[in-house]
Amino acid sequence: MSTIEERVKKIVAEQLGVKEEEVTNSASFVEDLGADSLDTVELVMALEEEFETEIPDEKAEKITTVQEAIDYIVAHQQ
């Protein structure tokens, strides 16, 4: 089983169409990985599905980097 970090990075790479090597923990979805607002919505939906969790809009807006996504998932795993 992959770690949460590996799974988040794989989803980010797939959703944003970038190489997994480009997906560093400090990478910003918009500035570093070229995501637009639709990409970020789709990314949040993919994370919710993968980790069987719900990310409220007000929380999703604050998740702007790969590490913030990892931290949120870790904190909200059952």
Swiss-Prot record:
Gene3D superfamilies: ACP-like. GO terms for biological process: lipid A biosynthetic process. Pathway: Lipid metabolism; fatty acid biosynthesis. Residues 2-77 form the Carrier domain. One of its GO terms (cellular component) is cytosol. Pfam families: PP-binding. Its main location: cytoplasm. GO terms for molecular function: acyl binding; acyl carrier activity; phosphopantetheine binding. InterPro entries: ACP (IPR003231), ACP-like_sf (IPR036736), PKS_PP-bd (IPR020806), PP-bd_ACP (IPR009081), Ppantetheine_attach_site (IPR006162). It is found in: Cytoplasm. Keywords: Cytoplasm, Fatty acid biosynthesis, Fatty acid metabolism, Lipid biosynthesis, Lipid metabolism, Phosphopantetheine, Phosphoprotein. The keyword Membrane does not apply. 4'-phosphopantetheine is transferred from CoA to a specific serine of apo-ACP by AcpS. This modification is essential for activity because fatty acids are bound in thioester linkage to the sulfhydryl of the prosthetic group. The modification O-(pantetheine 4'-phosphoryl)serine is found at S37. PANTHER family: ACYL CARRIER PROTEIN, CARRIER DOMAIN-CONTAINING PROTEIN. Belongs to the acyl carrier protein (ACP) family. Carrier of the growing fatty acid chain in fatty acid biosynthesis. This is Acyl carrier protein 1. It comes from Pseudomonas aeruginosa (strain ATCC 15692 / DSM 22644 / CIP 104116 / JCM 14847 / LMG 12228 / 1C / PRS 101 / PAO1). The lineage of its organism: Bacteria, Pseudomonadati, Pseudomonadota, Gammaproteobacteria, Pseudomonadales. The gene is acpP1.
